[in-house]
Amino acid sequence: MCIRDSGEAVRESTVPRAEIFVTTKLWDNDQGYDAALKAFDRSLEELGLDYVDLYLIHWPVQTLRTDSWRALERIKSDGMARSIGVSNFSHIHLQALFSTTDQRPAVNQIELSPFLQQTPISKFCRSHNIQLTGYCPLAKGQRFDDPTLSKIAAQKNKSPAQVMIRWALQKGQAVIPKSSNPRRIGQNADVFDFEISPDQMARLDALDDDYRLCPDPLSMP
């Protein structure tokens, strides 16, 4: 779904706008202060909305991220974005950002799953009240056959995907599993009628083996 389709869906929905959370991103080729402001204006125009709920810097481009963040602060102060945040920022990038501003990101969107827990970044964000949002929370389905995950899923009468999502929620993470299949989308949302026990959570925590599907943010200086 493209940005125009997303905006049209929001505008035509019978759900009140205040109950729909709209997030969009500043892409790498639009970073920098002036470029970021112009990019946001384009995104808002394409969405056909008066504001977005969350605007994120997609990647910590080394020479431009500070200026990009200043632009996001301006966008928020103008009331065009309710919250601002980052994506793929390591704890090192965040520490550098903190030295230039008093306004902390509300969110850091990073790759997270039981098989990639990114402990240093996760601990840093929690200690600074930055909400973690995990993308690829299902590891693109490539670890569904893991024996520990499969056993816990069978014990809960749930799918491995549902267990992975529930694990993330119990860790305090937001999750954005990707699917275009209506049945799977429904299953991914059906995770609020069970809990994973402390023992099962510990077994899932032990699955962390740095199984990464996307570029490592620590590779960016």
Segments the model singles out, each with a brief description of its role:
Residues 1-3:
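Short, small-residue-biased leader/transition segments that mark boundaries at the very start
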Residues 5-14:
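Glycine-rich loop at the start of a catalytic domain that most often binds anionic cofactors/ligands
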Residues 9, 43, 188-190:
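Helix-loop "lid/cap" segments that line or gate small-molecule binding pockets
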Residues 15-18, 47-50, 79, 103, ...:
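Structured loop/turn residues at beta-strand edges in well-structured enzyme cores
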Residues 17-30, 51-60, 88, 112:
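A short, structured active-site edge motif that brings together acidic residues
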Residues 32-47, 92-95, 116-117:
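Short, acidic/polar
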Residues 36-57, 74-78, 130:
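CE4/NodB-like, metal-dependent polysaccharide N-deacetylase domain
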Residues 59-221:
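Beta/alpha (TIM)-barrel catalytic core signal, keyed to glycine-rich beta->alpha loops juxtaposed to Asp/Glu
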